[in-house]
Amino acid sequence: MQMYFYNLVKDTDPEIAEAIKNELKRQQNKIELIASENFVSIAVMAAMGSPLTNKYAEGYPNKRYYGGCEYIDVVESIAIERAKKLFGAEHANVQPHSGAQANMAVYFAVLNPGDTILGMNLSHGGHLTHGSPVNFSGKLYNIVSYGVDPETETIDYDEVLRLAKEHRPKLILAGASAYPRIIDFKKFREIADEVGAYLMVDMAHIAGLVAAGLHPSPVEYADFVTTTTHKTLRGPRGGLILCKEKYAKLIDKSIFPGIQGGPLEHVIAAKAVALKEAMTEEFRNYQIQILKNAKALSERLIERGFRLVSGGTDNHLMLVDLRNKGITGKDAEKRLDSLNITCNKNAIPFDTQSPMVTSGIRLGTPAVTTRGFKEEDMIEVADIIHDALTNSDTDDNILQRVKALCEKYPLYSEFRE
């Protein structure tokens, strides 16, 4: 298969074509450890590049403001039904352009400006849209944040309950972007019921694990569940909302006409393809391997003297506290990237460094697992990280070790110029 997207673009716009080609090579030749990234299938990629991108389709299946939507309705209806089936949900909205907009839609559906949200502190593993003061959520709503216990570095449910009783939030938000442990959604439901709050769960990072039955599902406990469709779900970049049927009209109106106009039907088609892939035994085995790889990577890092926040991981990601290595997260990210390993700097709980410097890095296994990495490869990755950050091997040797792993598990080998 030719690198069709490059060849089709290069005659019209060689600059963009060159950037596309170089990005493909970057993905192929680097070890991707950013926990929120993954590699979609060729089928998902093809759906995103389909003629569906040409069609305006404001509204919902069989209730459009434009004519000519009969095939768009087929696509979106399939995506909706697959999302409901995969996660056991009563209602699904597949139109959010992103996870952030999915979260915004839930807020706009049931909250008024100034209402109180109880969500996880960004510096303890939460997300910008969970109430950060620089985000719309922090600007529009009264935010109360819970965090992790200083000793265990896991969610302090007693603190969550205490804060809920004290502040009486209208909505309690569970979910995180950098939390390596299983979240007790049943406990959050009990707390929400005690204070009469809505419960919303942002499962963006763990959606693939939930779909495969390898992480407790929030769907039975939460009034609203939001997620991205990339990350562990391995679909296109986009968002998804699941909710109880009684909230269906509120959510749908909040997305359109509330915060979005025309949906991206080519992306919705790609979501549908990814959701079908997620129903297979192959996908479940992939998620099992994600967990095995995360366990192997975390255990080897600990053996090599790294401290992991909370002592390890239950899911696909881990937070590495670098303070005992004498290097900041920012410098570690830069150092590893120079050696063809991609990760991101990340604050650790109670971090004294600024968010642009940080004391840690976040590592995840979804992307390398898609390539085919197994436990023994993750041990080598951990050793490479150790050697890179402690200068225990030459840069040339490390680059060769990274190259060997990338060549062992080629990515998008179907594409050629």
UniProtKB/Swiss-Prot annotation:
GO terms for biological process: glycine biosynthetic process from serine; tetrahydrofolate interconversion. One of its GO terms (cellular component) is cytosol. Keywords: Amino-acid biosynthesis, Cytoplasm, One-carbon metabolism, Pyridoxal phosphate, Transferase. It holds the Pfam family SHMT. InterPro entries: PyrdxlP-dep_Trfase (IPR015424), PyrdxlP-dep_Trfase_major (IPR015421), PyrdxlP-dep_Trfase_small (IPR015422), Ser_HO-MeTrfase (IPR001085), Ser_HO-MeTrfase-like (IPR049943), Ser_HO-MeTrfase_PLP_BS (IPR019798), SHMT-like_dom (IPR039429). The modification N6-(pyridoxal phosphate)lysine is found at residue 231. (6S)-5,6,7,8-tetrahydrofolate binds at residues 122, 126-128. The record marks 230 as: Plays an important role in substrate specificity. Its main location: cytoplasm. Its cofactor is pyridoxal 5'-phosphate. The keyword Amino-acid biosynthesis applies. It is an enzyme of class 2 (transferase). One of its GO terms (molecular function) is glycine hydroxymethyltransferase activity. NCBIfam families: PRK00011.1. Homodimer. Catalyzes the reversible interconversion of serine and glycine with tetrahydrofolate (THF) serving as the one-carbon carrier. This reaction serves as the major source of one-carbon groups required for the biosynthesis of purines, thymidylate, methionine, and other important biomolecules. Also exhibits THF-independent aldolase activity toward beta-hydroxyamino acids, producing glycine and aldehydes, via a retro-aldol mechanism. This is Serine hydroxymethyltransferase. It comes from Caldicellulosiruptor saccharolyticus (strain ATCC 43494 / DSM 8903 / Tp8T 6331).
